């Protein structure tokens, strides 16, 4: 029987063996297709010293091997010395002590990779002592609610409060005694019976310790008359933080006579009728809090006494949410040599820190790994990059994670895929990464020659296994890093050392993207091996792009060549118009095309180069590549590269200098492994060096020992904020490294948003390097209040937020409103000239700004006033001097006249003179008068004088009678027909005397001298008066009139003509020669003629000339 059984077994052996192999193979494929998961996470625990702690971890699939970590270190199974036991995914701490507290993680491993759980924190329970305090006396109005506060000591977990009331310990609310979650005791409707001593105690539910306060509070209940409402608790505004899902009680206790009524409002709206809120007396209770419960709550008390709304207190409630993490895919397959991008959506409040892990090992940024809070990018994927990737998020209230499995495929399928794509579409080959990332695009030109579709495995130049052939060398890029085109770029290259025993190039892969702060997706193009040119299109103007390209042969991806370039800027229409107008204004004959010529009048150092890009050269060296900008009018002579270590505070260090301008890339050697660096570049010409370029992105030198820096916990502290102007706020802060166990930081994040915004997405972020402790936030809105907070960060993540500061920008300055002129009302403005209308005025023209208009007007007015004063002062001085001189001239000093008998012309303005029957006469200023001639003996004519306002006198036969228009000032009679001694009076000057032998004729102020041309028409003989030296002067009684009396001689001579009318004094007898019957050429009327030898005056009657002395004016 046994033999038959054995025979049957032997006959079935091949079938059983095959079945076992199939099952094993199926299990292997199942392992490859399954993504490891931790379905039950270990929970954080608080235990007393010496207590037992049990941590559980459930994984899927369950056959995975589970290990544990303590504070990031692997626990090699059970450790008796440490007191830790590990059995079937469960960790047991037999006796908790200071060595076994910390963060625990379970790690599940399988051939496809490893996954780690979220950290579980194990801490020791403790209860501290009460702080020393003094006794407080609490007074409350009868019928109101009293509050006894208890300041609980520090406890972990939170201690429970107990009160000693009337020699009895109260552990829960009872009667009119309410024990609140905050630890306060509220005594409702207090009365005289509630007076007494109250004491509180703290109870730790884990250690079961009880500690009592060292001081007591005394309650007094008083009886008062009417009293306004007041809030006795809380004494000031409060900020409450609650975790999502928990209940919240906001306390508000008011006092007053009569007892006040308490109302609640949230963000300005009443909470009455809100489903989630209830009232516990005057306190507000919120069940199962959520994010929408965050906001500002207002408690207001009013009893009708005093000013309404005076008793108000505010609560600022923040609901914290544990993180939620989601990832789009659970599995991803990427061909070798291509890039993979993993996105991670993280939610939570406060914003969680994000940690990326591969096979349960934390990742740090490097040239191939680009990490951010929302995405992980892996460049040039290879077999070593396969595994399970985790996005783990953590904040103050919890942690969460998501998992994706990343697999790679061999590049040998690439030619086949390329051939299939080309045969189907007739376009250049699609990059293999297009299969892994559908968003990536293929850009190229159609109908390109097809490269070889396959390479036989027997070919000596293309071995079948990867690694047996040498990878292709990096192509040589020939294109310039700058282009004038705004939306395209011509990429040109050539292979390096093609042939030389290497496998032939099958195709090229070109990747390009815009260089921004957040990594964008690469645009990938596959190019045939015989094509060495590619036009990149649909680019943004004035933007910086980076290009990576590599050649592929049967050995896979070759070495990578990199270049960065900048597209041309698109000129703005208004800028072009202003430039053309400026050129036409400066040189009307110049054409707009001349604007393209450089302006050598503006010479300066070069502009700062663009931000450099960093690529790996070796384990301890990198390539720094940059693009120059403007040269400042002189050619760039050299470049210099500087670097800075991010984990150390210090200045920038010169890496290399004297780099020729033909080189736009340099290798920096001697870098420390595991150290993060930033690089920047300067350009130099003969006028100096440029400003430094923007620092490069952090670069971590590979070969690090694997140490992971923990994220900083404590953030910075903002110490100062100030509004610099209407769009800029400056802030300063302090950071204490000791608060984070001297954990190195890379820099700070500054968040700001308008204060009136409640949306966290409105926050904008600025990044500042770690060695700076001040920053200016620009491009803000005028007269707007902003909330400002900060974080510090390093490779491990971001710290907690700092304190929040509120600062308001300054108001925008008015554009000349106070000094604006009113619109014209009398006359409209003059229309501009045709030239002004037709000629365009550029923006660079000298136009007064509206804000300068008031100052311009004030300056013009003041300048005009000063000019008028300066002009008027000399005129007044001249006028005064002229009057004074005129008065002195009329005084007739004898010694002042020269012997040539000069005279001053005094035109007697007024009506013009007339002639009648050939007889001339003179006209006065306000009337007409016939001139009187004065005839001396021997026929010497003296002259004629006309006085204003005189009636006409008939001097010659047939002369017309003239009618005066005004009353006469001087009345004069014809001396030949009869003489009136009272009709002529001469006014003497105030300082003259008869002894001086001179008289002063006072003429009107507006009188002038008039020159009468001599006429040959003779008049009849006239009898003219002449002043006599021996004359008397007397004052008429009761009259300010001086009378000068003299004997006028008469002479009968030949006909005479009217001569000149001077008003002067004859200095000597030489001025009038009378011998031989000659005429005196000039002679003043009314002048004093002394009785000098050779002169005889005919006797005649006494003549009186009367003048009224006018007031002296200056």
Curated annotation (Swiss-Prot):
Name the source organism. Homo sapiens (Human)
- Provide the organism lineage as a comma list: Eukaryota, Metazoa, Chordata, Craniata, Vertebrata
Cystine connections: 57-106, 150-200, 252-299, 344-391
Q: What is this protein called?
A: Brother of CDO
Q: Where is this region: Disordered?
A: 422-474, 577-615, 812-833, 972-998
Q: Which PANTHER family does the entry mention? A: BROTHER OF CDO, PROTEIN SIDEKICK
What does the UniProt keyword field contain?
Answer: Cell adhesion, Cell membrane, Disulfide bond, Glycoprotein, Immunoglobulin domain, Membrane, Repeat, Signal, Transmembrane, Transmembrane helix
Q: Where is each Fibronectin type-III domain found? A: 474-571, 608-703, 712-812
Spans of biased composition, class Pro residues? 820-833
